[in-house]
C-alpha cells in the first residue's frame, strides 16, 4: 500500500461513522491512491493533494461508467477525509463541487424494493437450514427494521428487548451497530411477531454462549451475513436492505392506522429508522 493510501486510510478511519461507512471510505481512498500512482503523480500525503488530482480521479470514474449517485457518495468521502486532515478550504472549494465535477443532479429514488412476504419466507427457510442463528438475526431485521450491522450485533440487546416487551413497551431501544453509533428507538408494529422473534433468538443464543452468529470479530460476522444472504437469494433489487424497506412500509401503514397523516407517518418512520423526523420525503423516495 502506498504512503498516500496509508495516510488517507488512517484519516478515513479517524473520521468515524458506522462500520460500513468507514469501510467504504477506506476502499475509496485506496482506489484514489491507485489512480494517482497509475498517473505517475508523486503525492505521498493528503496534505499535498490538489483540486486537479481529485477532478482527474472523478473524470476517470465517469469514463468507467460509474453512476452519479456513487460518485456523489465518493466525493462526500473525499471531503470528509480532507476535513479530517485539516484541508477544510479545499474540501469546500467550488473547484471540487459536484456541479463543477459534472456529477450533480442524480435522482435519490430507491433502486431496491421491499421484499415480498413470499420471497422473505423462502429466504428465511433456506437460511434456517444453513444456520439457525443467522435466520434469527434475519427475522429480527425484518420485524424490527434493523440494518445489517444492527442485526449482526443484536444478540447484545435480546434480554433487554425481552424485558421491554414483557413490560408492554411500544418502542424498543436499538443500541449496538447503529449508524454513527447513535442509539435509536424503533416502533413495535407487530407485537406478536417481534415477541416470537426475540424469544427464538434468545433460545438460540442461550445454546451458543450468547451469540447468534459465531464469528471472532465484526468484519467476519458481516462477511458471513452478506455472503450467506446473497447465496440464499437476497441480491439485486431484493438486497438484505429490502427487509428494512418492507418494515418501513409496515411502519407507515401502522402509523396511518393510528390516525397520523401520511406526512406525519413518514416523519415518524424516518425517526424510527434513525434518519430523523426531517427526512420524511427521503423515506418516501428511497423506501
Question: What annotation goes with each model-predicted range?
Answer:
Residues 153-194:
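Conserved tyrosine-mediated DNA breakage-rejoining catalytic core shared by Y-recombinases
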Amino acid at each position: 500500500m502506498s504512503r498516500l493510501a496509508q495516510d488517507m486510510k488512517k484519516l478515513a478511519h479517524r473520521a468515524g461513522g458506522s462500520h460500513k461507512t468507514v469501510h467504504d471510505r477506506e476502499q475509496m481512498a485506496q482506489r484514489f491512491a491507485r489512480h494517482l500512482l497509475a498517473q505517475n503523480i508523486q503525492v505521498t500525503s493528503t496534505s499535498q493533494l490538489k483540486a486537479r488530482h481529485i477532478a482527474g480521479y472523478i473524470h476517470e470514474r465517469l469514463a468507467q461508467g460509474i453512476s452519479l449517485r456513487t460518485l456523489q457518495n465518493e466525493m462526500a468521502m473525499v471531503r470528509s477525509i480532507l476535513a479530517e486532515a485539516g484541508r477544510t478550504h479545499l474540501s469546500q472549494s467550488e473547484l471540487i463541487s459536484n456541479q463543477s465535477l459534472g456529477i450533480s443532479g442524480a435522482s435519490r429514488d430507491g433502486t431496491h424494493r421491499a421484499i415480498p412476504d413470499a420471497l422473505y419466507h423462502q429466504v428465511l427457510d433456506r437460511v434456517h437450514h444453513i444456520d439457525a442463528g443467522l435466520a434469527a438475526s434475519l427475522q429480527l431485521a425484518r420485524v424490527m427494521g434493523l440494518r445489517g450491522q444492527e442485526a449482526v450485533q443484536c444478540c447484545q440487546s435480546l434480554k433487554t428487548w425481552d424485558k421491554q416487551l414483557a413490560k408492554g413497551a411500544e418502542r424498543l431501544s436499538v443500541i449496538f451497530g447503529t449508524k454513527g453509533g447513535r442509539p435509536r428507538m424503533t416502533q413495535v408494529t407487530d407485537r406478536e411477531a417481534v415477541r416470537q422473534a426475540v424469544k427464538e433468538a434468545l433460545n438460540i443464543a442461550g445454546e451458543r454462549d450468547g451469540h447468534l452468529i459465531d464469528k471472532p470479530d465484526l468484519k467476519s460476522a458481516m462477511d458471513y451475513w452478506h455472503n450467506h444472504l446473497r447465496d440464499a437469494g437476497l441480491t439485486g433489487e431484493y438486497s438484505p436492505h429490502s427487509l428494512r424497506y418492507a418494515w418501513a412500509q409496515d411502519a407507515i401503514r401502522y402509523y396511518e392506522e393510528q390516525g397520523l397523516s401520511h406526512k406525519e407517518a413518514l416523519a415518524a418512520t424516518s425517526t424510527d429508522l434513525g434518519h430523523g423526523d426531517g427526512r420524511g420525503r427521503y423515506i418516501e423516495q428511497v423506501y
